[in-house]
Amino acid sequence: MNRAKVLSSYLGLLRTEKKVFQNDKRALEHVINLTRVQFRDNKNETDNTKINEMIDHANAVSHFLVKDLIQGVRKDEKTIQLKFDENTKSYQQYEFVNDQPPQRKKRGKIQIDDEQPTTCCGGGCGKPMPSNNSEKSTCS
């Protein structure tokens, strides 16, 4: 019974991958190879609970690929066309306009007031400035 479930989930996942990645040969080869390796690595598993968890995981991956995956195809340097399927969960057309970050604006020159600071060092200690230059500042 478990063998039939495992084979069914394996073949179903391979069919889903072929359907979803039909136009992306490199991605298709990668996911099929990854699926084969993972199923082959776990072929000697005898624990029924682990086998059922792995079957559920394979079915969840298959469901994710059909319902949630959206592929993008680069049309030119700034345009990517998203490929939606009729099975995709949120089939909406989005148009990204001005998705580049805005250009930084140049600031003008910083103006510094010619006033003398009213505190001793101008640094915010709050102590008054000494009346003549011979006195030392009490700031630490």
Curated annotation (Swiss-Prot):
Polar residues: bias regions:
130-140
InterPro entries (alphabetical): Complex1_LYR_dom, Complex1_LYR_LYRM7, MZM1/LYRM7
Q: Which cellular components does GO assign to this protein?
A: mitochondrial matrix
Has the keyword Chaperone been applied to this entry?
yes
Could you tell me where this protein is found in the cell?
A: Mitochondrion matrix
Q: Name one GO biological process term.
A: mitochondrial respiratory chain complex III assembly
What ranges does the record give for the region Disordered, renumbered to this chain? Answer: 93-140
Q: Enumerate the Pfam families for this protein.
A: Complex1_LYR
Disulfide bond entries: none
> Where does the source fall among the domains of life?
Eukaryota
- Is Chaperone one of the keywords? yes
Which intervals of the chain form a coiled coil? none
Record's keyword terms, sorted = Chaperone, Mitochondrion
Named from the GO MF annotations, one term is:
protein folding chaperone
Subunit info here reads: Interacts with UQCRFS1.
Record's family? Belongs to the complex I LYR family.
What is this protein's function per UniProt?
A: Assembly factor required for Rieske Fe-S protein UQCRFS1 incorporation into the cytochrome b-c1 (CIII) complex. Functions as a chaperone, binding to this subunit within the mitochondrial matrix and stabilizing it prior to its translocation and insertion into the late CIII dimeric intermediate within the mitochondrial inner membrane.
The protein here is known as Complex III assembly factor LYRM7
Please tell me the species this chain comes from: Dictyostelium discoideum (Social amoeba)
What lineage is on file? Eukaryota, Amoebozoa, Evosea, Eumycetozoa, Dictyostelia
